Amino acid sequence: QMCIRDSMVDFGIPLFANIHLCGSVLTEVFFVMTVSKVLYGQLPAPMTMVLFCILLGIFAVGAPGVPGGTVMASLGLIISVLGFDDTGTGLMMTIFALQDSFGTACNVTGDGALTLMLTGYAKKHNIQEVQSGEIL
């Protein structure tokens, strides 16, 4: 039986909600490849995708909590790095809006799982909870 400590929730959930955006980032990468194949007939070059993924990971940290924020923050990347035109950009925004709730569910579930892992780590290494104002 795993019990999550309040201090882990207070620390882990806000941290992971801001930096752990697997649902948003993964779906956007897959949608970029799909839209590119459908509209332009080919996938982006592998090195272009590597650059896009790295930059998307950085840009996504600036957009947590905003519905569709990841795709809005990355529009410049989609246009400049991948070379999408207005049609590709519009299709990306439409598809992302349709599935954004599933990406959010993935993000929230992942945040809870990571908080459980953090609790397990603290328990395994005998890390004691410190009350606020208490001196170690």
Where are these regions (language model features)?
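Short glycine/threonine-rich loop-to-helix capping motif typified by GTGT followed
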Residues: 21-31
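Short, small-residue-biased leader/transition segments that mark boundaries at the very start
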Residues: 2-4
